[in-house]
Every structure is written in structure tokens, then in C-alpha cells.
């Protein structure tokens, strides 16, 4: 059986995501196949709260065609594109069953993305990057310019968001020595930050509609729309950072300059700007505007802000994801889990009792994720729904 892996956020699960899964099954033809997803939990890569809780999004994914959804733990979920990719690849590799990593791409050319990945891994690339950064370029522009000097026009793949992630996936596969093959699927719908077209819309556009209380059902699968409506009725959605803004600002104002330094992973002095801004800012947007410089994208700053709020440091990131936490699955996924438990390289978590058998490092990571989940629920629209300890009490959704 062919097993495809997808590294995702599904924030929320929409028609474009279903199209990708359906396309994988079409590519498999008559051969039996399964789809395993490594999905971010309650917080996501752009440094923000997911619009609905992880189990709801995982259920929507399985009802939309996925077979098994595993959680990408917090430190990797709110990391850079490089860290996000490394965590996702680590999970898929640890299953021992995934043979192909599929992802959307603006260029649709895995070989081109692999060439760019190899360029970024060259021993002379860091020096070339530093030279470009010294010219005052943003990190993204400097990276593309440095890569262009090594591989020419192929460096253009470092301009588009999905291609950039694809390059990072290829890098992670190369660095880990994994036998998983990359599969770039040409995107035929709107871009990462685009609006809507032909019945499809970007996740960011859908989140904007949902946050504003507008109807986005035309862009969601019927199952995803129904699940989201259920979450809203229960007072659990939409979730936004603005709902937790006072808690976030309170945490940041209580921190000293040395505290902020713990979350500045690049040791680039950003922590001083955060410390100064946190003293006076009356909103998260105001704080980020005060910290912003030409060199850093807002997503980078939001990730650092979220890491500070949730107390996630580089020390919390093991070399590999130490467990496979199941969020949702169907019957095919359950059968796959039996194989994973026998041949996988990481323990599978389906209930809280499984945590006690983990290594000390893995237990610490799970506890961190559980604490973050307790902070996440406090951003629910209705506090009556914000009961804590969900990570310890909620099991997988079986579809």
C-alpha cells in the first residue's frame, strides 16, 4: 500500500485541502493508498492561535479524506519554515510507513526544489548569506540573492511561500537521510495570501471571513463547515489572539529583558525591542509595529511573541519528535496505527496513560503542549467552554 504524508495546519480545513487529498488518490490509481497528516495543534506557524481547536480540525481532515492525523507538537508548530518542516518530516519518518511527502507548490517541480535545498545546505552558503544580509536586505531577499549566486534562476523558487516550504521539506529529508520521496503538486487555486477564485479561497481569507462572522461555507467542505458551526455553537470558535490579548500583554509586561533574550533564537537583539515595546504597547498590533524593522517579517515577530507568551525556548526542541500523538483517524488509519506501533521509531499516544511510559524528555514536551492548550482555551469566545486539562482528557476522534 502506498502511504502519502502531508505536513499541514488545516486552519481551517477547506476545499483546496480536500482537492489535494483527492489528487493523491487519483495519482495512486488502482493501487491502495493511505494519507497520513502531521498537523499543527492549537497554535500555528504564523505565530497565532488556530481558529478552532486541533481535534476539530483533525476531524474535519479525516472526514475530508485523510486517514490518520498526528499532532505536530508546539515547538515545531510555531517555529520558522525550517523548524516546521523538520518537525513534520520527523513525524512522518517516525511512522515507518510513509513513502511519499506530498505538498502544494507554485512551481510543481520537486527536482527544482531539491536543487535549491542542496544549495542552502552547501558549506559556503552561510557566508554568502551573511554578505547579502550585510547589504541591508531582508532575510528572504538575502537568501534568494545568495542562492542565485550558486544555482542561478532556480533560486526563484525561494520567492513563493509554498515553494519555500517545499524547499525546507526537501532540506529536512536530505538532512535526515530519509527515504521518503518529495512530491510537489502544482497549485491550481489561489495563492497563500490570496482571496477567492473558482470556489476556492486561501486559508487566510477564510479565517478573515470567519473571524468577521461572515459565511465561508462556499470555501469549506460540508463536513468542515458543520464542524465549525458546532464549535461556534459550543462557544469554542472562532479563536483569535485578540481574545487573549490582555493575558498576552500581561505576561510580556511582567518579563525582564533577560527573559525576552531566552526567546530570541537568532540572538539578533530583537529581545531588546520587544522588552521596550512591551512596556508601553496597549495592543498586540501596536507592540509588533513598534518592534518591526525592514529585516524581519511580521510572522517572525509573531512567532517570537507567541514563544514568549507560552514559554517555548530552543531548549524545548529535541532533535526529533519523541512521540506520535493521534488526533483523529478512520478505520484505515486505525489499521495503519497497528503497523506503526510495530515498525515505527516513536511511541504512539492515544490516551493520557501512554504519557507515563515516555522518556523524561518526551514527558516534558507533552506537558509543555498541555500547558499551552490550557492557555488556548482561555481565548475561546465564551469562557464557559474554557475548561482546562484538555490535552490530558481528550482522546482521538474516531470517524
PLM features: what roles do these ranges have?
Residues 1-57:
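N-terminal catalytic cores of NTP/NDP-binding nucleotidyl/phosphoryl-transfer enzymes
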Residues 25-29, 62, 92-93, 174:
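N-terminal cationic-hydrophobic initiation segments that often serve targeting/anchoring roles
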Residues 31, 65, 96-97:
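Short loop/turn motifs at secondary-structure junctions
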Residues 59-73:
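A glycine-rich helix N-cap at a beta->alpha junction
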Amino acid at each position: 500500500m502506498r502511504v502519502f504524508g502531508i505536513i499541514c495546519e488545516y486552519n481551517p480545513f477547506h476545499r483546496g485541502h480536500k482537492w489535494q487529498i483527492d489528487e493523491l488518490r487519483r495519482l495512486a490509481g488502482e493501487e491502495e493508498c493511505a494519507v497520513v497528516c502531521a498537523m499543527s495543534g492549537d497554535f500555528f506557524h504564523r505565530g497565532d492561535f488556530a481558529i478552532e481547536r486541533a481535534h476539530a480540525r483533525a476531524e474535519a481532515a479525516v472526514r475530508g479524506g485523510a486517514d490518520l492525523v498526528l499532532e505536530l507538537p508546539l515547538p515545531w508548530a510555531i517555529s520558522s519554515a525550517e523548524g516546521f518542516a523538520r518537525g513534520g518530516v520527523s513525524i512522518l519518518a517516525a511512522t515507518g510507513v510513509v513513502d511519499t511527502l506530498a505538498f502544494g507548490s507554485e512551481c510543481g517541480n520537486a527536482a527544482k526544489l531539491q536543487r535549491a535545498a542542496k544549495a542552502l545546505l552547501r558549506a559556503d552558503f552561510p557566508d554568502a548569506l551573511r554578505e547579502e544580509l550585510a547589504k541591508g536586505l531582508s532575510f528572504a531577499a538575502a537568501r534568494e540573492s545568495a542562492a542565485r549566486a550558486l544555482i542561478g534562476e532556480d533560486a526563484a523558487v525561494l520567492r513563493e511561500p509554498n515553494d519555500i516550504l517545499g524547499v525546507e521539506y526537501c532540506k529536512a529529508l536530505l538532512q535526515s537521510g530519509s527515504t521518503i520521496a518529495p512530491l510537489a503538486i502544482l497549485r491550481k487555486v489561489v495563492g497563500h495570501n490570496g482571496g477567492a477564485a473558482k470556489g476556492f479561497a486561501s486559508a487566510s481569507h477564510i479565517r478573515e471571513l470567519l473571524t468577521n462572522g461572515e459565511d465561508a461555507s462556499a470555501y469549506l467542505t460540508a463536513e468542515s463547515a458543520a464542524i465549525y458551526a458546532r464549535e461556534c455553537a459550543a462557544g469554542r470558535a472562532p479563536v483569535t489572539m485578540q481574545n487573549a490579548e490582555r493575558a498576552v500583554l500581561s505576561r510580556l509586561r511582567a518579563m525582564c529583558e533577560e527573559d525576552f533574550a531566552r526567546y530570541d533564537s537568532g540572538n539578533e537583539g530583537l529581545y531588546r525591542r520587544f522588552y521596550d515595546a512591551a512596556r508601553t504597547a496597549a495592543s498586540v498590533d501596536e507592540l509588533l509595529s513598534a518592534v518591526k524593522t525592514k529585516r524581519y517579517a511580521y510572522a517572525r515577530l509573531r512567532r517570537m511573541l507567541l514563544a514568549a507568551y507560552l514559554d517555548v525556548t530552543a531548549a524545548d526542541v529535541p532533535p526529533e519528535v519523541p512521540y506520535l500523538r493521534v488526533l483523529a483517524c478512520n478505520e484505515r488509519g486505525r489499521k495503519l496505527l497497528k503497523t506503526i506501533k510495530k515498525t515505527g521509531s516513536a511511541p504512539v499516544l492515544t490516551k493520557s496513560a501512554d504519557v507515563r511510559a515516555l522518556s523524561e524528555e518526551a514527558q516534558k514536551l507533552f506537558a509543555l503542549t498541555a500547558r499551552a492548550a490550557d492557555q488556548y482555551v482561555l481565548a475561546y469566545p465564551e469562557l464557559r467552554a474554557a475548561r482546562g486539562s484538555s490535552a490530558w482528557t481528550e482522546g482521538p476522534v474516531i470517524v
